[in-house]
Design a protein with these regions (language model features):
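Long, acidic (Asp/Glu-rich), low-complexity accessory segments flanking structured domains
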Residues: 212-231
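Short glycine/proline-enriched turns and hinge-like loops at secondary-structure junctions
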Residues: 62-63, 130-132, 156-161, 174-177, ...
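Alpha-helical interface subdomain recognition
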Residues: 1-77, 81-82, 90, 98-103, ...
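Short Ser/Thr-interspersed hydrophobic loop/turn segments at strand-loop and sheet-helix junctions
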Residues: 47, 71-75, 167, 183-188, ...
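Short Gly/Pro-enriched turn/cap motifs at secondary-structure boundaries
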Residues: 84-85, 111, 126-129, 153-156, ...
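A short core secondary-structure module
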Residues: 148-192
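A short, Trp-centered hydrophobic/proline-enriched beta-strand micro-motif
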Residues: 114-122
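Flexible, small-/acidic-enriched active-site or ligand-binding loops
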Residues: 133, 186-217
Length: 377
């Protein structure tokens, strides 16, 4: 399906913002391992903290394709920023779908306005793709809940104002015994135990969170008791589509740098781009980027049309994330030695993009999903 005028407008506006505001600052934020909070306000002013959230709740009222396009363009400016925005929109979407009116008023509107930053706390030290195996417990305590457990690799776990935390409320019920809670990060017992030292995306903090007798009010239960697993899975498709879009954006940034360098740098008396080996490499890079873009847009448009898209979302994420790492590696190769030093952006983009094959379901999980879909075709 062709993109509409709304989609072209958001692509143009976010691309302009990414090139003027994010690209010039990305290397410094990476070195400092810091994302300035004032940037969240700028993003919110463009509607990017609640792209698919209705206007009545402070959002931009756009569709999932618009969100994915925005993520792509943000990632072309800075991968870490796109991750922060992506998770914030994930939290906003969960609050929209499962939050009470009071929870939406208290949390969703401020998130969309850039006043609050959200985190998604599902993964645990020994639990990754199998969400049903979490061990964090939530027990009734007085008039509320007491949480105990450890969450691992939580994006914005330190800098967020609130986290959607998943915990077991009835072990005997298995998946149906998992619930979700809105946990303020200033709640007693919410402890940032460690900030991970990562290969890339340094400006986006990734934390280990310890919940130690963390007490929250009863009204912080999200949805209803026992629907946490359903909440966790409800955003699988959009999460994977957005990571695919993010991968395409970072690949595009690496490609832009590579083609600019290939036109400027001369070798054996002519620009690099005039050497067939280099032009062929660039041709493959451009083809992969466009293929990844079409895959994620197709999946996003299926979701907006209310049609099943689990297989298509997995295809988009699998292809785009692996393509993006290859494109970034090729961009380094085109730069030669300069590609391996921090004076040029491609080494940072290469570090940033590697994780896209891991989070929101590793590549082999995507292959498993696609394979199962084909078995039933």
């Amino acid at each position: 399906m062709p993109l509409g005028e709304q989609h072209e407008l958001i692509r143009d506006s976010v691309r302009k913002f990414a090139r003027e505001q994010l690209r010039p600052n990305a290397a410094r934020w990476d070195r400092e391992s810091h994302f300035p909070r004032e940037e969240l306000k700028r993003l919110a002013a463009m509607g990017l903290c609640g792209v698919a959230i209705p206007e009545e709740w402070g959002g931009a009222g756009m569709d999932h394709a618009s969100l994915a396009i925005a993520i792509e363009e943000l990632a072309s400016g800075d991968g870490a920023t796109s991750t922060i925005v992506q998770v914030n929109n994930l939290v906003a979407g969960i609050l929209l779908g499962y939050g009470s009116s009071a929870q939406k008023q208290r949390h969703l509107k401020p998130i969309a306005r850039g006043e609050l930053l959200g985190a998604f706390a599902l993964t645990e030290p020994h639990v990754g793709s199998d969400a049903s195996a979490i061990t964090t417990r939530a027990e009734r305590a007085g008039g509320g809940w007491r949480l105990n457990g450890v969450k691992q690799f939580i994006t914005s776990g330190r800098n967020a104002d609130l986290a959607i935390v998943f915990a077991v409320t009835d072990k005997a019920e298995g998946k149906k015994g998992i619930s979700a809670f809105v946990v303020p990060t200033n709640a007693p017992g919410y402890i940032v135990a460690r900030i991970e030292e990562k290969a890339g995306q340094h400006a986006s903090d990734t934390a280990q969170i310890v919940l130690e007798n963390c007490e929250i009010p009863a009204e912080n239960l999200l949805g209803a008791e026992g629907v946490g697993y359903r909440i966790a899975l409800s955003n699988l498709e959009s999460g994977r589509v957005n990571v695919a879009a993010q991968s395409v954006g970072m690949a595009q940034a690496a490609f832009d740098a590579a083609i600019a360098y290939a036109k400027e740098r001369k070798s054996f008396g002519k620009p690099l781009i005039e050497h067939q080996a280099v032009s062929f490499r660039l041709a493959d890079m451009a083809t992969g980027i466009e293929a990844g873009r079409q895959l994620y847009l197709h999946a996003a448009q299926l979701r907006d049309a209310g049609r099943p898209c689990l297989k298509e979302a997995s295809m988009a994420k699998l292809f785009a994330s692996e393509m993006a790492e290859k494109v970034c590696s090729d961009a380094i190769q085109i730069h030669g030695g300069y590609g391996y030093v921090s004076d040029f952006p491609v080494e940072r983009i290469w570090r940033d993009v590697r994780v896209t094959q891991i989070y929101e379901g590793a590549s082999d999980i995507q292959r498993l999903v696609i394979g199962r879909a084909l078995e039933g075709a």
